[in-house]
């Protein structure tokens, strides 16, 4: 089972021991989107959707999701998140979501950034489903990461 750090020699799952890794400043940015109908977009740009402030709810949910990443993703290390931002931009076809997570720790924050985007998108669908049950989540991906032994990476 070589090549998979989360599997031991017998193929059993394990949490990677990061004790000896150096603490470094690490960041990660992820993106995703929710495609919505023109009617729903007009409501988001205007009076809002019936359930409330969808953008604010999605932003907060994304931040909260990042903080809960190790509870959701098996074998993901709990790390001290030092900052999470979630930006939502309403465009002509839906809502673009960008999340950036930051820490100084022994392992990266890629999963936290991806979880923030995922939960923000899920919340946007929940907040808008009464107006647009066809809301579609897509394109969730890591865009950049910095820090750690492997150094910076950009899509």
Question: What is each residue range found by the language model?
Answer:
Residues 1-55, 60-77, 81-155:
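C-terminal binding/interaction regions
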């Amino acid at each position: 089972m070589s090549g998979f750090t989360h599997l031991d020699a017998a193929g059993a799952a394990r949490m990677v021991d990061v004790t000896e890794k150096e603490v470094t400043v690490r960041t990660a940015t992820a993106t995703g989107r929710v495609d919505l109908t023109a009617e729903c977009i007009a409501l988001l740009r205007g009076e809002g959707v019936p359930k409330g402030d969808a953008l604010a709810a999605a932003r907060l949910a994304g931040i909260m999701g990042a903080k809960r990443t190790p509870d959701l993703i098996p074998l993901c290390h709990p790390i001290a998140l030092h900052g999470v931002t979630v930006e939502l931009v309403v465009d002509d076809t839906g809502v673009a979501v960008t999340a950036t997570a930051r820490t100084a720790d022994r392992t990266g924050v890629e999963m936290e950034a991806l979880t923030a985007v995922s939960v923000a998108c899920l919340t946007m669908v929940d907040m808008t489903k009464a107006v647009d049950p066809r809301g579609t989540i897509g394109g969730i991906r890591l865009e950049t990461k910095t820090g750690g032994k492997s150094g910076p990476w950009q899509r």
